[in-house]
Design a protein with these regions (language model features):
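Conserved hydrophobic positions within beta-strands
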Residues: 79-81
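Gly-rich Lys/Arg/Thr-decorated short loops/hinges at beta-loop-alpha junctions or inter-strand turns
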Residues: 134, 155-169, 290
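Acidic low-complexity segments
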Residues: 83, 88-145, 149-150, 205
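N-terminal, Lys/Arg-enriched amphipathic/low-complexity engagement segments
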Residues: 1-49, 99
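Ferredoxin-type iron-sulfur electron-transfer modules in oxidoreductases and energy-metabolism complexes
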Residues: 345-361, 371, 375-440
């Protein structure tokens, strides 16, 4: 199906704007408090294990996975629990959060130690205990991902980092290559997957060279340069380009014999196996045309966006128009700067008022550029018409559910139409109707 769709799929050659690619991560000043969400992942929220007044340390488990598809949560700071209270997530739902007043000491919990791993069962138990989730943005629990129902012969490491401005994965590769290799080798050894492919866009030659050097005597691990075209990092496209396979419609990567892990995720796994320290902080790229000091910061999980942005600073004479969490193309706009960072926060993009101003929208001229540059080979113009008519059957024929909202159609549209937003609405409508069983 995917190959049929990609008859004209090119992907857009967008400006990379990787100004921080050489910015080695530095720790930000410790905030006065953090708010750690019990839902930082796909699946059931974790259940808080602490109460107001409890003393916690760096690495203390403060949330227990709330089901099979869930993840443990750990404290990113040492200090005292100030509150355990509901907090509204960016999607409008409520979940518990743990507010911790920091003591400035960053004392590590004595219980933090490297896990004893001897076989597959103990390996999966260690991964679950670590609370590791996909750090590329989706947040799917890693221990669940490593237990597929289908046979898998390829571990695929997504190191493409095609999003505009983001360079946190790049810095992870440059500074933590040994951790990446350690994590990969552990997955291969304990799951029985015979080989691994690391997919890296060819605009990161230093990363390619370093990982090639680190894996030159490891025949099970291949480093594969990829074209630096926007959308390469999407799972379906990555699987097509690396193992050269097609994921069945509606299927998971394992249905094509692959498991996909983000490069920072597998690096974090390598670190946990060596030290026992879970993901309590992460590298976040802070950039954008309104940012005074673009840089990569090491940020404790739960730090407010405001504290992170204050570290980077607002450019003089510039009015902040919008902040985007994640990449500028796919990340959501931030409504409240008090919102806390999570395990999956890879970047905060500061846009000036001029840049954030919506463009003048003009009528569609049917130039076909949205079709030409869609990495999935979809037809946004036709989808728009089908959605306007609420034609579920036609939306299905147009495969609207393949859209992953990369933003390419909006980027290349000369009429400045909000194609991506329309595709997102159409996809949500279609999936909702299919779930209800309507107009098939």
């Amino acid at each position: 199906m995917l190959n049929k769709l990609k008859r004209a799929a090119l992907g857009a050659h967008t400006p990379h704007d990787k100004a921080t690619a050489a910015s080695k991560p530095v720790p930000m000043p410790l905030p006065a408090q953090v708010r750690i969400l019990m839902s930082q992942h796909i699946g059931a929220p974790a259940k808080a294990l602490v109460k107001k007044g409890d003393e916690v340390f760096v690495g203390t488990k403060i949330g227990e996975a709330g089901g099979f598809v869930s993840a443990n949560i750990h404290s990113s700071v040492s200090g005292t629990v100030a509150a355990v209270e509901p907090f509204r997530l960016s999607n409008g739902r409520m979940c518990d959060s743990v507010v911790i007043k920091t003591d400035g000491k960053q004392t590590v919990d004595p219980a933090v130690k490297a896990p004893e791993v001897t076989d597959k069962a103990s390996f999966l138990a260690a991964v679950r205990e670590s609370g590791l989730v996909g750090l590329g943005g989706a947040g799917f629990p890693t221990d669940v991902k490593l237990q597929p129902k289908d046979p898998v012969d390829t571990l695929l490491i997504n190191a493409s980092e095609c999003e505009v401005w983001l360079t946190s994965d790049t810095q992870e590769m440059l500074n933590c290559a040994d951790d990446i290799v350690r994590g990969i080798e552990a997955v291969l050894k304990y799951t029985g997957i015979p080989k691994c492919v690391i997919g890296i866009e060819n605009n990161k030659p230093e990363c390619i060279d370093l990982l090639c050097q680190k894996t030159k005597d490891k025949p099970a691990i291949e480093v594969k340069p990829l074209p630096s075209v926007y959308g390469t990092g999407a799972e379906l496209i990555l699987i097509e380009k690396c193992p050269g396979r097609e994921v069945p419609h509606g299927g998971l990567p394992a249905a094509a014999g692959a498991i996909v892990m983000n490069v920072t995720s597998v690096s974090s796994l390598g670190k946990y196996l060596a030290t026992g320290m879970p993901v309590v902080s992460r590298v976040i790229t802070v950039d954008g045309d309104a940012c005074e000091k673009p840089q990569n910061l090491i940020v404790p999980v739960g730090t407010s966006y405001e504290d992170v942005l204050n570290t980077a600073g607002l450019k003089g004479g510039v009015t902040l128009g919008k902040v985007v969490a994640g990449g500028a193309r796919m990340g959501p706009a931030v409504r409240d700067l008090s919102y806390p960072t999570t395990k999956t926060t890879s970047g905060l993009i500061m846009l000036s008022e001029a840049t954030a101003q919506p463009p003048q929208v003009n009528p569609c001229i049917r130039c076909g550029r949205c079709v030409e540059y869609c990495p999935m080979g979809l037809e946004p113009v036709e989808v728009n018409q089908a959605y306007a008519a609420r034609d579920v059957q036609e939306l299905g024929k147009l495969h609207v559910d393949y859209c992953f909202n990369c933003g390419s159609c909006t980027f290349v549209c000369p009429a400045k139409r909000p194609c991506t937003q329309m595709m997102g609405l159409a996809k949500a409508f279609y999936l909702g109707e299919i779930k209800k069983g309507g107009n098939k």
